[in-house]
């Protein structure tokens, strides 16, 4: 599953990655964090000077070694590592296209209130729709401005104005 944390809000409290970790379950069940601005996923791009073909051969070689090792030790975490390498390789090609919302119609951007690349909750809602269209089964959107310990009357409109419209748009768009 994919996790996205938006920027902005009244009181952007930190959110720990343990909230989408697998805990005591196998690590294949943990979430993949997408950054809401900048590079969508850390360390998915090829190193400088490495072509996609070279990277593909490297992933195949590592997979072969991991499969050989797994026949000996039969560790579920090895199978998870193989799947993670393969997923990262596929993501190198698919994530840039996913994150490019420049071809979205203007009325869709307006419906969400999204400004591409700003890292807002609205932009993340639009990306969530695009992820769902590509088969991602679980998408968790965090908006970090909801930790109210006071000032509800003063700040509720601010928080709702950042989330109501894009949430409605996402539901309508699905």
Could you tell me what each predicted segment is?
Residues 1-174:
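Ligand-binding pockets and gating/stacking loops
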């Amino acid at each position: 599953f994919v996790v996205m944390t938006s920027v902005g809000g009244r009181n952007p409290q930190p959110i720990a990655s343990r909230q989408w970790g697998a805990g005591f379950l196998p690590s294949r069940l943990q979430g993949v964090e997408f950054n809401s601005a900048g590079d969508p996923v850390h360390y998915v791009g090829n190193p400088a000077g490495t072509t996609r073909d070279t990277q593909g051969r490297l992933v195949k070689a590592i997979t072969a070694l991991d499969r050989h090792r797994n026949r000996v030790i039969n560790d579920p975490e090895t199978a998870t590592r193989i799947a993670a390498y393969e997923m990262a390789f596929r993501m190198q090609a698919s994530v840039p296209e996913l994150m490019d919302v420049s071809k979205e119609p203007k009325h869709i951007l307006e419906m969400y209130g999204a400004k591409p690349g700003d890292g807002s909750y609205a932009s993340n809602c639009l990306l969530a729709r695009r992820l769902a269209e590509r088969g991602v089964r679980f998408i968790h959107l965090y908006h970090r401005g909801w930790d109210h310990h006071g000032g509800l009357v003063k700040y509720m409109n601010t928080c709702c104005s950042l989330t109501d419209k894009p949430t409605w748009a996402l539901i309508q768009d699905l």
